[in-house]
Amino acid sequence: MSKQVVVVGGGVIGLLTAFNLAAKVGQVVVCDQGEVGRESSWAGGGIVSPLYPWRYSPAVTALAHWSQDFYPQLGERLFASTGVDPEVHTTGLYWLDLDDEAEALAWAAREQRPLSAVDISAAYDAVPVLGPGFKHAIYMAGVANVRNPRLVKSLKAALLALPNVSLREHCQITGFVQEKGRVTGVQTADGVLAADEVVLSAGAWSGDLLRTLGLELPVEPVKGQMILFKCAEDFLPSMVLAKGRYAIPRRDGHILVGSTLEHAGYDKTPTADALESLKASAVELLPELEGATVVAHWAGLRPGSPEGIPYIGPVPGHEGLWLNCGHYRNGLVLAPASCQLFTDLLTGAEPIIDPAPYAPEGRLG
């Protein structure tokens, strides 16, 4: 297939879409308004699971399961080809004092996932630094986290090594070029960039771009703030989650604690209120963090969408335009499956899963 495909947006979805397409089409161009991988893909925690997977629709679950199984080999492949290790780090995850534990266990039995109730004493034995007072725990082995800044760095390096891929950073896309009802390129600040197919993977900004065609994509920015501590490498052996807040151990002893959910438009300014709230959650989960130095505090913008179900597929009435966006809190979680499904659809291959729940048709205003 000798097509030129332009991918608008260089987050993990756009980069992995380009990585997959590069083996199938003639030329791939990735455009990003800033540096690739510096928005929500960089800012998130990197847990390779929805925070509460049993609360999501079957559509999200199908993508999550495929992606979770694929991540280890993706990490190994990128490390081998680029020398940049995305650090897919399997630690397991403890959920503490859930209100819907029965639903979680029923979901696990139905989906055949290794999630089970554990005695709280076993949780404290496994995670001695866990804060006091927790009464109940469930645990899922095999849950990993990925160091997302390193993931996007490795994807960027992999793409730069491919002769048929080009990255255009600081490339402002202002709209789409159309001829006879077909999208034939994008309008940039420097002129027209022609394409046989255009993929919109611009995260929280996707709706703004689609609006230039008179279409309403119900994707909006949802701000999330995180903080980072530096501890001993063996300080926290597993991820822990309680009351909507989590702590994630990296291999080098960094501990991420997050996150907030804020509707603040496109403002990414870290706030003092969020810092204090996140520090309080950190100490409740891990009291030894009391008084510890917060080595970083940042914010990112998630692409909020109804029920977190992404839009994957062609845009009706605008031949040549495709969507792979709207993953909300789970862009990194769902990326491998979303991008493989998208590649299957664009190239006419047999899709890895039923694409119907993600189709833009009938879901745009």
From Swiss-Prot:
MF GO annotations: FAD binding; glycine oxidase activity
Organism of origin: Pseudomonas putida (strain ATCC 47054 / DSM 6125 / CFBP 8728 / NCIMB 11950 / KT2440)
EC number: 1.4.3.19
Binding annotation for substrate: R302
Cofactor(s) the protein requires to work: FAD
Protein's UniProt name: Glycine oxidase
Keyword Translocase applies: no
Primary role: Catalyzes the oxidation of glycine, leading to glyoxyl imine and hydrogen peroxide as primary products; glyoxyl imine is used for the biosynthesis of the thiazole ring of thiamine. Otherwise, glyoxyl imine is spontaneously hydrolyzed in water to produce glyoxylate and ammonia. Can also use sarcosine (N-methylglycine) as substrate, and, to a lesser extent, N-ethylglycine and D-proline. Has no activity towards other amino-acids D-Asp, D-Glu, D-Gln, D-His, D-Leu, D-Lys, D-ornithine, D-Trp, D-Val, L-Ala, L-Asp, L-Glu, L-His, L-Leu, L-Lys, L-Met and L-Pro.
Temperature dependence (free text): Optimum temperature is 40 degrees Celsius.
pH dependence: Optimum pH is 8.5.
Principal EC category: oxidoreductase
Gene3D superfamilies given in the database record: D-Amino Acid Oxidase, subunit A, domain 2, FAD/NAD(P)-binding domain
Residues engaged in binding FAD: 12-13, 32-33, 40-41, 45-47, 173, 327-333
Family membership noted in the UniProt record: Belongs to the DAO family. ThiO subfamily.
Catalyses which reaction(s): glycine + O2 + H2O = glyoxylate + H2O2 + NH4(+); sarcosine + O2 + H2O = methylamine + glyoxylate + H2O2
GO cellular component, one term: cytoplasm
